[in-house]
Amino acid sequence: MDLIILVGIASALLVVILTIFFLQKKKGGTEAKEAAAPPQRGVPLRAQEGVPRRAQIARNQRNRLRQNAPAAAPAAAAALQAADAEGDNDDENPDGDGQRMPQGAVLDEKMGAKKRAKMEAKEQKRLHREQELIDREQRKVKEAKEEAERKQQEDFQEEADRKRAEAERLVKEERERKEHEEYLKMKAGFSVEEEGFEEGDADDQDNLLADFIQYIKDNKVVLLEDLAVAFKLKTQQAIERIQDLQANGTLTGVIDDRGKFIYVSEEELAAVAKFIKQRGRVSIVELAESSNNLINLTPVSAGAGEGSS
């Protein structure tokens, strides 16, 4: 009886030991097969090894571009965001031939030279497009700055022109005011006291001044004493009147040492100046001879009489 029990116990232990042995052997073979099995084709090796994906590398490159071009931030940022989305879509969507773009080491190991060149060209094209966007925005900023500077320069020039015109207007008004004061002073001098006419109204004084000027222009060469007698003035008063008229530009001419005033018109002065300019250096004798031809000293009344005869 005891022998049977011992044999049964020994048999049970043997069965247990054999079962454990076969289980361990089976488990070891499964692990060896799994270790020897190659990685799956659908999962990139770079992803299995923890290497960053292509999209992450592209984002890093775009971040560096953003740091190098801060001036083009507003519009370029939107373009770069669109490029990011496009890059993500490229990662998620297959290429034109229906295959996903290989990543990392798979790109080098499994992609042929032609396919790799195509992918590199595509990447270069994308980077070139992003750089063009940045350059375009920088160019717009530069053009806007130049336009602002040009507008500022135009405003400055307009302000300078306005100030210059204002200064010229003030000078002209001051000159006209002085000429008017000299005219009034000269007109008041024509009112004679004991030797001439009684003082008339303003119209009479204007007419008297106009007659005085016209008398000199008509006679061309006027003896100052005769001029004073004609207008009931003293000789010195007549000389002062002529000097005042010369000062304000009403009369042009010279008073010689014989007591005569020779009237020369603006046109005759211009003709003499033109002659001197054309001839260059001119002697006094040549100038005197030419002046006799350029300056008409014949009285108007005498010239009219000769023309009618």
Curated annotation (Swiss-Prot):
Biased composition (Acidic residues): 85-95
Top-level lineage group: Eukaryota
An example molecular function term from Gene Ontology annotations: ubiquitin-like protein ligase binding
Lumenal side of membrane: 1-2
Keywords of this entry: Endoplasmic reticulum, Membrane, Transmembrane, Transmembrane helix, Ubl conjugation pathway
Family: Belongs to the DDRGK1 family.
Protein name: DDRGK domain-containing protein 1
Subunit structure and binding partners: Interacts with Atg9; the interaction is transient.
Gene3D superfamilies (UniProt xref): Winged helix-like DNA-binding domain superfamily/Winged helix DNA-binding domain
Side of membrane Cytoplasmic, spans: 24-309
